[in-house]
Amino acid sequence: MAFEIDLLPVGSEKKSGDCIAMRYGDLVNGKEKQTVIVVDGGYVGTWKDTLKPFLRKYYNCEIYGKIHIDLVILSHPDQDHVSGLVEMAKDEDVEIEMIMMHRPWEELSPSWFKDGRITKSSLKDRLGDAFGKAKELDDVTKNISKTRLNVGNYDYQGASITILGPTPDFYKTCIANCEKTPQQEDYVKNLPQTHGSNGPIELEPYRYGNIKWDDNENTSAINESSLIILFEYDGVKVLLTGDAGKKGLTNAINYAHVNNITLNDCNIIKMPHHGSRKNVNPSIMDAFVGSEMLFYSCVSDDLGHHPSKRLINFMKEKRFKQYSTSGKTLHWGKNAPDRGWNDVSDYGFYNEIEI
């Protein structure tokens, strides 16, 4: 049996995005003997310009003239993750079997918000408007099976998919804290506010073993709502983190520990939010030590923010191999057909890192 994963180049003009394709099973002797999964779809143009031609060329997944995708996973409803999935779902050349996605307009009740005038119906409309692209994806795939999401393990066509987070309560807390939603009730826990600059960065000389971390930098509530998924198949382990932040990742690591799930032996960890240092801290990164490779999805010209030089050097000290898309498709496989592609070099140490 075989497995392969591809992080496709998404974004331009300093704006990164996520689009991941995976397939496993018998990748040689018939299209019906493999399973194809797409995780996030990048921007509006990603489907037509990148993902669709890629699937046709490399995944051999056209059945009776349609591109067959067994499972689509939306990590969270940010534009750089969901927009391309909408275009894919609208395409008459595509057949999708199943979708895993949160639907906040179906999952939250008016009791989470202060405005006493909100009814269940009006809240559904407001959340649908707030997360318009995700709602559009839900609408155009209304006849496709969707799984109600919770932490736990799902057996899927010979593979194991474990949702490590978020729990339903933490997910609802994230949505209630989102800038796009009404003001949450007092009993709803506040998440740390987003801090950190997106402007030009300042650098300082790097000194081995002396990297400091600012735990006051945080990601957004909507990023914290990201699905964190451990995929396992035939000895392969891949951890997918969406744009999850420190709270979500810490919760997921704790859940894994309580349930005897190891995260220090993964083949690949897709690092959150294009390699932003705001999403992780040393204790989170230490939980991954022993795993093999870290993958980053980012454009090549991102003002130096993604991936973080501080993060790259910290993980180099932990002996990780690290790779990024940076305008190219990032591929890894086990027993997969040879594409004749060249190996890519992993990151070395930076001489300077962000202050």
Model-derived features: positions:
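Divalent metal-coordination and catalytic microenvironments
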Residues: 9, 22, 40, 76, ...
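Active-site environment of divalent metal-dependent phosphoester hydrolases
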Residues: 44-46, 77-83, 106-109, 170, ...
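Metal-dependent catalytic neighborhoods of phosphoester/phosphodiester hydrolases
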Residues: 49-50, 82-91, 111-114, 281-285, ...
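Long, structured stretches of catalytic cores involved in phosphate-ester chemistry, encompassing
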Residues: 110, 258-332
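Long, well-ordered mid-to-C-terminal structural blocks that present hydrophobic/aromatic surfaces
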Residues: 229-273, 279
